[in-house]
């Protein structure tokens, strides 16, 4: 057997369905779109949920419950491992995190998360700390200050 004689296993490759190639193909003339109407046109069709002008089902059913998401506080998250860029003994404030690029946009404050390891003794000031973040900062000899 030579390289040019290699062929895929029979039945493993399916030919694309070619529309509009004669009536005998089964997909000729209208190409599976039926006769006339919005769906037969190029770019035709209606959006999902549209019922031809009839009040759609999702609007006929009552609303239920509420969502409190927009009232929740949005904290900028910074991991403990990211704080290793600062020098030993630095007081890490939210302004310092922003100027260093670790916290790009501070809305309701900064939350320090406990992912990774901290190797330097730092005093960290932030709005929120996770339990593991507090443990890791204090284990490195640093201090945690909730602002």
Swiss-Prot record:
Keyword Ribonucleoprotein listed: yes
Residue span of region Disordered: 1-54
Superkingdom as given in the UniProt entry: Bacteria
GO cellular component: cytosolic large ribosomal subunit
Presence of the UniProt keyword Transmembrane helix in the record: no
Gene Ontology MF, one: structural constituent of ribosome
Cited Gene3D superfamilies: 3.100.10.10
Keywords: Ribonucleoprotein, Ribosomal protein, RNA-binding, rRNA-binding
InterPro entries, sorted: Ribosomal_uL15 (IPR030878), Ribosomal_uL15/eL18 (IPR021131), Ribosomal_uL15/eL18_sf (IPR036227), Ribosomal_uL15_bac-type (IPR005749)
Biased composition (Gly residues): 22-31, 42-52
Residue pairs linked by disulfide bridges in the UniProt entry: none
Pfam families tied to this protein: Ribosomal_L27A
GO biological process, one term: translation
Record's function text: Binds to the 23S rRNA.
Protein family per UniProt: Belongs to the universal ribosomal protein uL15 family.
Protein known as: Large ribosomal subunit protein uL15
Source species of the chain: Ruminiclostridium cellulolyticum (strain ATCC 35319 / DSM 5812 / JCM 6584 / H10)
């Amino acid at each position: 057997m030579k390289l040019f004689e290699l062929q895929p296993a029979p039945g493993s490759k399916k030919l694309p369905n070619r529309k509009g190639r004669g009536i005998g193909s089964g997909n000729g003339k209208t190409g599976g779109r039926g006769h006339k109407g919005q769906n037969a046109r190029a770019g035709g069709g209606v959006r999902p949920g549209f019922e031809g002008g009839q009040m759609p089902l999702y609007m006929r059913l009552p609303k239920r419950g509420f969502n409190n998401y927009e009232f929740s506080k949005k904290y900028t998250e910074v991991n403990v491992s990211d704080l290793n860029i600062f020098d030993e003994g630095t007081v890490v404030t939210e302004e310092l995190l922003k100027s260093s690029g670790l916290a790009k946009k501070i809305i309701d404050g900064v939350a320090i998360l406990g992912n990774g390891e901290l190797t330097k003794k730092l005093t960290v000031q932030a709005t929120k700390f996770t339990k593991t973040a507090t443990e890791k900062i204090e284990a490195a000899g640093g201090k945690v200050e909730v602002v």
